[in-house]
Amino acid sequence: MTTIERITTPRIRIFDTTLRDGEQSPGCSMSPPQKLVMARALDELGVDIIETGFPASSQSDRDAMALIGRELRRPSLSLAVLSRCLQADIETSARALEAAANPRLHVFLSTSPLHREHKLRMTREQVLESVRKHVSLARSYIDDVEFSAEDATRTELDYLIEVSRAAISAGATTINLPDTVGFTTPEEIREMFQQVIAGVADVPNAANVIFSAHCHNDLGLAVANSLAAIEGGARQVECTVNGIGERAGNCSLEEIAMVLKVRQAFYEQDSSINTPRIVGTSQLLQRLVGMPVQRNKAIVGANAFAHESGIHQHGMLRHRGTYEIMRPEDVGWEDSQMVLGRHSGRAAVEARLRALGFWLEEDELKLVFEQFKGLCEQQRVVTDADLQTLMQGGSNAQGYRLASMTISDVGSRANALVELSDPDGNRVAETAQGDGPVDALFGALSAATGVQLMLDSYHVHSVGIGADARGEANLSVRHEGVEYDGTGTSKDIIEASALAWLDVANRLLRQRQANAASTTEAPAPATA
């Protein structure tokens, strides 16, 4: 699809940065194989651009780009990487993009007076010269170049126009005006886009340039500001699944996509998002990074389509439109949960796993199906929660796995004995005492794995149907000052708690392995 075709189509381009900006959220880092799994889901979701990472920062991001580029070849999908306005960064990014069928090189530089003085220590003219030089360099490698004016919403309007003109003249095909610190308001950002677009109109090829919004959620306005930017002329929105990202996060992909769908008559724009895949994609990300969304999260929260008020329930029974502006099935929720059993075949199990966001290779599917049939011998039905439990057990295959545990009372205290299989298949056993079974359990797990976690919050609840219901444990912990979330599911809530603890511990161990494999010192995180 050409640039001219893109700009004349009444459609908003969805630039997903879950794998780059979203991953910068504390505790949300992903390994290259995990990024590939997430990228597959984003491809099925129908995003237009996937930003895979920041190649100059680590070998891990370069490996992820190579994996994703080799597999995802959809003609309408672009793969992007981020680069500072530095020659070495741009050259590294260009090499990383060699695997992509449709590459985009995304370069950024701060433009606000605060950043120019304290971060860059550069004058206005020096920033302009750097933009000209490095956008031109990027364009010499890649035809599709995006330039981001970091902290655009705190940049002088006349200077922002000047920088945008310079970037377009140097060959930029997309101009991104980020609200880097979530400072602006809808009225301000709408006016900013209108003024900048008008201010570059006479630059050659400006009519073919896409203007993009990248809004952070520090004041809770990321989605509202992105919509206002669309009203001001933006035709690309940069966002993340579940709104994850630095500090308070980014514009939420699922929210922006559903606003454009539900209120299409107002905005006269739509997106290419395959909306019935939204919930599955959201749940996949929650599992990969261990960060559940709050129950009242729009679109993907567990309560998004729940009605408890008697008045609301009565209205819903009369007509769904009384209290629902969209159907649950339009975003991937189901009115009734699909139930599998002993007579279900492998194709049905595979289809349900894909709907839940799990894409398995043939050998992986064979193993999970064998586990599924074993579960069918123990209970009448297998629900979505049961399938997620099976997949969670498989996710620990390369880390510590729970072999057995024993909890007993020792006077006023509890004693826990745990036996684990370590990543090499060896058995490790440790005991610990604590002020209750969970405290003792976590102490024993810490001793067995060598991982120290500080518990912030912990709760359990039931998932599943009737007598086959299982307990799900959710915990939030800290490790070296960074927050992590873990989830575990089992018939026994203490075992579920152990699985939740190991969920975090195994993720930390995988991160250590990925960091050890990296051969390049990481620069400061990008925030554009």
UniProtKB/Swiss-Prot annotation:
Transmembrane segments: none
UniProt-annotated location(s): Cytoplasm
Cofactor(s) recorded in Swiss-Prot or TrEMBL: Mn(2+)
InterPro entries: 2-IPM_HCS-like (IPR050073), 2-isopropylmalate_synth_dimer (IPR013709), AIPM/Hcit_synth_CS (IPR002034), Aldolase_TIM (IPR013785), LeuA/HCS_post-cat (IPR054691), LeuA_allosteric_dom_sf (IPR036230), LeuA_bact_synth (IPR005671), PYR_CT (IPR000891)
Enzyme class: transferase
GO biological process: L-leucine biosynthetic process
Catalytic reactions of this protein: 3-methyl-2-oxobutanoate + acetyl-CoA + H2O = (2S)-2-isopropylmalate + CoA + H(+)
CDD domains: DRE_TIM_IPMS (cd07940)
GO terms, molecular function: 2-isopropylmalate synthase activity; acetyl-CoA C-acetyltransferase activity; manganese ion binding
Pathway where it operates: Amino-acid biosynthesis; L-leucine biosynthesis; L-leucine from 3-methyl-2-oxobutanoate: step 1/4
Highest taxon listed in the record's lineage: Bacteria
GO cellular component terms listed in the entry, alphabetical order: cytosol
Listed EC numbers: 2.3.3.13
A UniProt-annotated Pfam family: LeuA_dimer
Chain residue ranges for the region called Regulatory domain: 401-528
Binding-site residues for Mn(2+), renumbered to this chain: D21, H214, H216, N250
Domain Pyruvate carboxyltransferase: 12-279
Protein keywords: Amino-acid biosynthesis, Branched-chain amino acid biosynthesis, Cytoplasm, Leucine biosynthesis, Manganese, Metal-binding, Transferase
Assembly and oligomerization: Homodimer.
Family under the similarity heading: Belongs to the alpha-IPM synthase/homocitrate synthase family. LeuA type 1 subfamily.
Role noted for this protein: Catalyzes the condensation of the acetyl group of acetyl-CoA with 3-methyl-2-oxobutanoate (2-ketoisovalerate) to form 3-carboxy-3-hydroxy-4-methylpentanoate (2-isopropylmalate).
PANTHER family: 2-ISOPROPYLMALATE SYNTHASE 1, CHLOROPLASTIC-RELATED, HOMOCITRATE SYNTHASE-RELATED
Protein name: 2-isopropylmalate synthase
